[in-house]
């Protein structure tokens, strides 16, 4: 069995800042982390590998510094890491990103074996679109299961998988055939911690590095800014809004009934009583 997990290096949202003039995210000096939802996807993949055998390949698209996140994924137990990096990818929106990643997954299948499962996090904390995973599935003609919280059962012999999917008002149990793309929510599994030996192994590991050409990307105009129909015009922090509030004083006496309390409130704010009466008449 071969599983591919797409991860992304993102700024630590707890320390992110917005430039006061340009209203853009200031990334300089901000530490980076693996997107948290991608860690849930990685843990799900590693547990399936531990139970059923096979290999887990982690894939990321980004600048050379994204190698740090790949090595961390190797520390957690991934078998292989692929870095997709090229200046042509700069400025990619979700459409261009899914195009490049889908091409890389196709290439991974040719070189290392076709994956039965592709995992992504449900979304990234810097973009929050939740579009890249489904975009990859569409381009790869894969069935997709989104917002999955638990892998309930994997039947490799039968070529099918059963999952629990979080839905409004409850949980759905879904079963589908392989191959499939799954986007993961936070689940019931705790993320493993790599040992010192794992970290040393990851530090020595070879990172497979591909350019757009290496990944077999045919149309470079579909990559980066040129292949991105959406552009972020502005990022800004909302201005604090002063809330208008009225302070009322309640007499420090025992209030036995709700009517007594309302009498004190409405006696202090007669206008409020009038508004409530009018609202009641309207209803």
Describe the role of every protein-language-model region.
Residues 1-283:
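N-terminal glycine-rich FAD/FM-binding segment characteristic of electron-transfer flavoproteins
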């Amino acid at each position: 069995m071969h599983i591919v997990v797409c991860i992304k290096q993102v700024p630590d949202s707890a320390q992110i800042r917005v430039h006061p003039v340009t209203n853009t995210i200031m990334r300089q000096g901000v530490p980076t982390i693996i997107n948290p939802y991608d860690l849930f996807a990685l843990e799900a993949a590693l547990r399936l590998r531990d139970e059923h055998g096979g290999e887990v390949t982690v894939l990321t698209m980004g600048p050379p510094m994204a190698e740090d996140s790949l090595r961390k994924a190797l520390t957690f137990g991934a078998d292989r890491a692929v870095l997709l990096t090229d200046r042509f990818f700069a400025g990619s929106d979700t459409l261009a990103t899914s195009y490049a990643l889908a091409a890389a997954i196709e290439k991974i299948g040719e070189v290392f074996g076709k994956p039965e499962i592709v995992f992504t996090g449900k979304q990234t904390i810097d973009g929050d679109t939740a579009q890249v995973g489904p975009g990859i599935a569409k381009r790869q003609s894969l069935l997709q299961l989104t917002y999955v919280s638990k892998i309930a059962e994997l039947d490799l012999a039968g070529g099918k998988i059963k999952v629990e999917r979080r839905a409004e008002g409850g949980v759905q149990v879904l079963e589908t055939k392989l191959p499939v793309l799954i986007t993961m929510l936070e689940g019931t599994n705790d993320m493993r911690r790599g040992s010192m030996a794992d970290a040393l192994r990851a530090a020595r590991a070879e990172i497979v590095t591909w350019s757009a050409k290496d990944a077999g990307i045919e149309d470079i105009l579909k990559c980066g800014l040129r292949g991105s129909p959406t552009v972020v015009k502005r990022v800004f922090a909302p201005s604090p809004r002063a809330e208008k509030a009225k302070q009322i004083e309640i007499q420090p006496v025992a209030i036995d009934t709700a009517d007594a309390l309302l009498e004190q409130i409405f006696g202090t704010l007669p206008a409020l009583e009038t508004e409530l009466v009018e609202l009641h008449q309207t209803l």
